[in-house]
Design a protein with these regions (language model features):
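Function-determining surface determinants
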Residues: 1-506
Length: 506
């Protein structure tokens, strides 16, 4: 592997003109002879998911003319494209090859789309020693952002040499002047910084002495921002996670209004319950379709394709439900709700006589006590509705903890959330088995009304139903031990240690 040293050129861009580059590298000519290669120019489109999943994993994906190029540890990888790609794109829509194999796991269920487009030029200069032997290559590259904003060209000079001493000697000569500096990071990083990306839209952190009404309004504005940020992706069906994150923000809003909405002036809006109901059918179908291949592989009888008519029916149902979802999200009712709510929150005066710390002590105590009381009441004879109620209370505690996290002691917070998540996982498995069983029966009835599905499909669906019932029974069996662990003295001690004693309501 050749040695690479990265430098930054601080002078005016050269456009990679032959004479201009040779002039800037002239400090090397007393020792070396320089032979410039041809000038190359291209456009690059950098791709990532909306939440920057590739970048977080050290991957840089570019669409160049006719190919996808991925840089990262162990790379680069390149896949030639059969035609012009369409963005956004899920992993399954990418051309088969090394690039898709590498990014599929990082992308998860999210789609990639252009983050920025750049115009790039480069020229390689061969460095020869006194005997005429090539000892290094100097690549002079200039990159300018084109979209979403135009940026001035950034010049990156890369010294490559088989031997470390040659690379270091050339770099040392260049760095002796005042126009070169040591560089680090990638071209992509530099372009992102110059373009003001990634955007970081964050609300002020909640502090202990903040008025309670201002603290709650701040948290709710953050949730409103999250709802707004996911509307377009949901309407355009970019990927299923946009709808999921929109729903999470709605649930957080409703939970916080229930827990601390009395701190705000006026009656809380009731429209978020409507948004929850509007988005539920499509999300339920998304979950089914995302898990479909896994469910099909569980089948122990029949053929793998027996469930394909069921998949097609789910897609038909989803298309129908999505039409209603899109109408709702594009309606005046939804826009009035979101705009009016955000405006009202921005007008909260912050005149409460109660501090955020005092409110946290009071409400976390109430919500935690409610969870512990419901958890202690669960027995083997408890109804599914009782278990579902406990799950809802656990979510409310989880959201409350997230809101007041800046005020909590870090270690007790970590332990409380860990214990709570463990219980939520069991409760979720129980409810998923119940809900999916009910939905499966409903989908089977609708398939029969729409036509005459193959007997093999109905038999395979029957096996799925049995597995959902088995999942629910297994979760019910696991629930007892999960509750015992959660109700132990450790959880109560950790809850008590979340906040200073003076803040914890008695």
């Amino acid at each position: 592997m050749p040695i690479e040293l990265i430098l930054r050129w601080q002078g005016r861009p050269t456009g990679c003109g032959r004479a201009e580059i040779l002039d800037q590298l002239s400090v090397l000519t007393p020792t070396y002879r320089l032979t410039p290669g041809p000038r190359q120019a291209w456009d690059a489109t950098y791709l990532d998911t909306v939440d920057w999943r590739l970048r977080k994993r050290g991957l840089v994906l570019r669409h160049l003319a006719g190919s996808l190029v991925l840089d990262g540890e162990g790379g680069p990888w390149r896949t030639e494209l059969p035609g012009e790609p369409q963005w956004p794109a899920l992993a399954g829509a990418l051309a088969p090859g090394e690039v898709r194999d590498q990014v599929e796991r990082a992308m998860w269920v999210r789609a990639i789309a252009p983050k920025l487009r750049s115009s790039e030029v480069s020229r390689e200069v061969t460095v020869l020693d006194a005997e005429g032997c090539a000892v290094a290559e100097v690549e002079w590259a200039e990159s300018a952002g084109v979209e979403p904003v135009q940026t001035a060209p950034l010049t990156r000079v890369t010294v490559r040499a088989p031997r470390k001493r040659d690379a270091e000697r050339i770099a040392r000569i260049l760095l002796a002047g005042d126009q070169f500096q040591s560089g680090e990071g990638t071209v992509y990083d530099a372009l992102l910084t110059a373009s003001g990306l990634p955007e970081r839209r964050t609300r002020p952190a909640i502090t202990a002495d903040m008025p309670a009404d201002a603290a709650i309004a701040t948290a709710l504005l953050g949730f409103a921002d999250a709802i707004e940020a996911n509307v377009a992706g949901t309407v355009e069906d970019v990927d299923t996670e946009f709808l999921h994150e929109l729903r999470v923000a709605v649930r957080r809003t409703r939970s916080l209004l229930k827990i601390a909405g009395d701190m705000l002036p006026g009656a809380p809006p009731k429209g978020f319950k409507w948004v929850g109901a509007l988005t539920t059918p499509t999300r339920d179908l998304d979950v089914y379709l995302l898990r479909f291949d896994e469910l099909a592989r569980r089948s122990t009888v029949g053929e793998l394709g027996d469930l394909e008519p069921f998949r097609q029916h789910l897609r038909w149902e989803r298309a129908r439900e999505r039409r209603a979802l899109v109408r709702g999200l594009q309606s005046k009712k939804f826009r009035k709700l979101l705009d009016g709510w955000s405006a009202a929150l921005r007008e909260v005066a912050g005149g409460s006589g109660v501090t955020a710390a005092e409110l946290a002590g009071e409400r976390l105590h109430l919500v935690a006590d409610d969870v512990l009381r419901h958890a202690a009441a669960i027995t083997p004879a408890s109804t599914a509705e009782d278990v579902h109620t406990l799950r809802k209370r656990c979510k409310e505690l989880r959201y409350s903890l997230e809101v007041f996290r800046p005020l909590c002691a870090p270690e007790p917070y970590r332990k409380v959330v860990k214990n709570l998540k463990r219980l939520q996982d069991v409760l979720g498995a129980f409810q998923d088995g119940e809900v999916q069983s009910a939905h499966l029966r409903l989908y089977a009835e609708r398939m029969l009304r729409r036509g005459d599905p193959p007997a093999a499909t109905l038999l395979a669906m029957g096996e799925l139903l049995a597995r959902f019932v088995e999942q629910q029974q297994h979760a019910r069996h696991s629930l007892g031990s999960a509750l015992d662990k959660f109700l132990g003295a450790g959880t109560r001690e950790q809850l008590a240690a979340l906040l200073p004693a003076a803040q914890w309501a008695s």
